Curated annotation (Swiss-Prot):
Organism phylogeny: Bacteria, Bacillati, Bacillota, Clostridia, Thermoanaerobacterales
Catalytic EC class: transferase
Pathway: Protein modification; lipoprotein biosynthesis (diacylglyceryl transfer)
Species of origin: Caldanaerobacter subterraneus subsp. tengcongensis (strain DSM 15242 / JCM 11007 / NBRC 100824 / MB4) (Thermoanaerobacter tengcongensis)
Protein name: Phosphatidylglycerol--prolipoprotein diacylglyceryl transferase
Gene: lgt
Record keywords, A-Z: Cell membrane, Membrane, Transferase, Transmembrane, Transmembrane helix
Membrane-crossing residue ranges in chain numbering: 13-33, 49-69, 88-108, 123-143, 152-172, 186-202, 223-243
NCBIfam families: PRK00052.3-5
Domain of life: Bacteria
Function per UniProt: Catalyzes the transfer of the diacylglyceryl group from phosphatidylglycerol to the sulfhydryl group of the N-terminal cysteine of a prolipoprotein, the first step in the formation of mature lipoproteins.
């Protein structure tokens, strides 16, 4: 299966090029931020607080995403070619870095203002799931996050489409669970759990990335174990599961409609 010859540029204005990757990321941020804002105002969160929170989370989310990607893949850029670190428009963001950076910044700001974060992190799931789905589409245009070659009839695993499917499934799951009246905090941590499980099992197994712990590699089938993400998966699953149990067993747990 040949990789389609798609341009990474949506359009150009002279020397300025607008990338599909950036457009899809901006759409996910805008839609996710708008959803969080509308839902949180229904719970009487202050509008100015929410706007400031969204700005802080987006900024530190992008910073965290880029820094973790560079640290994991091209740490030499910091010394040999630091300009490359800032070329976000060319792609190269870590989903885990985005979540970590945005979460820590949001947690700090909420605690500083004395505001409960659990409902807000639940509402953020829409932006996270949509972002994973759309950014993987952007990866297709950038010709990155490729699957491994395989001797199956399709020639190469469509790793980006696997990521799109994971994001779509988790987005649908969010709205389904939202009808179940679960305690606040459950949506976010269950999302983290299932995202990591699905990505570690399905996407990473066929993605053409180095195996940091090469336990198994079948070049004919195009599958391999274990990538860096897969090595980290058990620890993330344990953390997410522990947080889920904590939310469900909290005697002071709260609910929202």
């Amino acid at each position: 299966m040949d990789i389609p010859s798609l341009s990474p540029y949506a359009f150009k204005f002279g020397p300025i090029a607008v990338h599909w990757y950036g457009i899809f990321m901006a759409i996910s941020i805008a839609v996710g931020g708008y959803y969080l804002y509308k839902q949180a105002t229904k719970l009487n969160y202050d509008e100015d607080f929410l706007l400031n929170l969204l700005m802080i989370v987006v900024i530190f989310g992008v910073i965290g995403a880029r820094l973790m990607f560079v640290l994991a893949n091209y740490p030499e850029w910091f010394v040999k070619d630091p300009v490359q670190v800032f070329k976000i428009y060319e792609g190269g963001l870590s989903w885990h870095g985005a979540v970590l950076g945005g979460f820590l910044a949001g947690l700090y700001y909420c605690r500083k203002k004395g505001v409960r974060i659990n409902p807000l992190e639940d509402f953020a799931v829409v932006g996270l799931a949509l972002g994973n789905m759309l950014v993987r589409v952007g990866n297709i245009f950038n010709h990155e996050v490729l699957g491994r070659p395989t001797e199956f009839f399709f020639g190469r695993w469509p790793a980006q489409l696997v990521g799109v499917a994971i994001g779509a499934f988790l987005l649908i799951r969010y709205f389904y669970v939202q009808k179940k009246h679960m305690p606040d905090g459950y949506q976010f941590w269950s999302f983290i759990f299932y995202y990591q499980l699905l990505r570690g099992v399905f996407e990473e197994t066929v993605k053409d990335v180095p195996l940091v712990w090469p336990v198994y590699l079948n070049e004919e089938w195009g599958i391999g174990l274990f990538t860096m993400t897969q090595v980290a998966t058990p620890f993330i699953l344990i953390l997410a599961y522990w947080m889920i149990k904590r939310v469900l067993n909290d005697p002071n747990r709260q609910y929202y409609d």
